[in-house]
Structures are given as C-alpha cells and as structure tokens.
C-alpha cells in the first residue's frame, strides 16, 4: 500500500559493529557488504576484551561482555540520534535463550521481538527472530557475505554453546522439538508482558 511505502521510505539504515578488541577480528567484509547496498557503516572500537579478560578475569565472561557491548552501542546510538536497533537474533537464538533461562535461572524466558529500553531511549527489534539459523547461514553463503570469525577465547565453550548442543541432541532424539518450543516460549512471554 501507499502508506506502507511512505513508512518504508522514511526509514534510514545505519550499520554499526562493536569491536570488543579481540585480536584477529576483521570487519572488512561487513564494511564492503554495507557499501555494496549503500548503507553507512561504522565500527565502534572498545577495550571490552581487556576489561573482561584482563581486569575482571571472570571464568564466565559472556554476561559482562554482552552488557558492555550493549552499553557501547546504546551510547553511540544516542550520540547519532538513532532510536532503534535491529539485532540479528534468529529462531535458534530465541530457543537457546529460553533453554538457558530454564536451566540457569529457573524461569521460562526469552527475548521478545520488540523491546523498548527507556534507560537507553532505544527500541530493540529482532526482525529475524522467526528465521532458523540455517536460513540465515544459507542467505549469507548465497550472497557471498564474508562472515567475521569470532576470536573470543571462550567461543565454543559457553553456556549458550552448551544450550545449542543440548537442543540439537534433544531435537535429534525428539524430532520437531525446536518447532514446538518456539510458539510455547513466545506465548509464555506474551502472557507475562501484561
């Protein structure tokens, strides 16, 4: 419709990557992809890796790293006057988060598709929340997008990786489990929003 077209035209895209400071992370592919689709791109350089791994020396650094990354991003968004951010969380991320919440927190929670964060003045949207990780991976391959290699020292041995492997095992032994968890998780989430 014309109204939808007008809304779409008013949206401006601006891509930002938070560089946490791990050696060997190369964002050149991200920059080139953004240039190819005419989207401005900026890399926010931080010392988060140093803070998390040298200053704090936490055995499970993911939570602190995530908080610091988000803080750096929200700060930059505020400086730019941007009030929305789209995260690339996919269906598998949603399911893994629900499983992690159940295992480690004793509650059934996962992130909603849209969240307003009043302290940051930012609305978080997750446009790929219903897309399986394999669908995202196939798109990336088909488009020839260069993936940034994660050089975090704990990559592959995190609570999220454990939840991912556990969910894969459960789904192998009980085919369709992933597809059944998503709507239940989302329904539960919606029931607790009100």
Where are the language model's segments positioned?
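ATP-dependent adenylation/nucleotidyltransferase module used to activate substrates
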Residues: 1-98, 104-107, 134-142
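Conserved active-site and cofactor/substrate-binding residues in soluble primary-metabolism enzymes
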Residues: 68, 131, 176
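Catalytic subdomain that performs nucleotidyl-dependent activation
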Residues: 11, 94-172
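An accessory alpha-helical subdomain
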Residues: 166-185
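Glycine-rich beta-alpha junction loops
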Residues: 20, 154, 185
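Low-complexity, disordered terminal segments
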Residues: 8, 187-188
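A short, hydrophobic C-terminal helix/tail in secreted or cell-surface proteins
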Residues: 191-194
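Alpha-helical elements of Rossmann-like donor-binding domains used by nucleotide-donor carbohydrate transfer enzymes
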Residues: 29, 72, 165-166, 180
């Amino acid at each position: 419709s014309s109204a939808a077209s007008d809304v779409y035209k008013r949206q401006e895209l601006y891509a930002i990557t938070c560089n946490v400071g791990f050696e060997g992370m190369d964002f050149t592919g991200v920059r080139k992809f953004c240039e190819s689709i005419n989207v401005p791109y900026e890399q926010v350089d931080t010392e988060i890796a140093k803070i998390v791994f040298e200053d704090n020396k936490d055995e499970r650094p993911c939570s602190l790293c995530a908080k610091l990354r988000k803080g750096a991003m929200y700060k930059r968004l505020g400086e730019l006057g941007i009030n929305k951010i789209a995260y690339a969380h996919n269906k598998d991320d949603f399911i893994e988060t629900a499983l992690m919440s159940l295992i480690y927190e004793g509650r059934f929670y996962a992130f909603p598709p849209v969240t307003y964060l009043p302290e940051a003045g930012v609305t978080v949207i997750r446009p790929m929340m219903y897309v399986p990780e394999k669908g995202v991976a196939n798109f990336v391959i088909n488009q020839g997008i260069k993936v940034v290699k994660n050089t975090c020292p704990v990559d592959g041995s995190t609570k999220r990786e454990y939840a991912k492997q556990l969910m894969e095992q459960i789904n192998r032994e009980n085919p369709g489990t992933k597809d059944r968890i998503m709507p239940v998780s989302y329904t539960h989430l919606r029931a607790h929003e009100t």
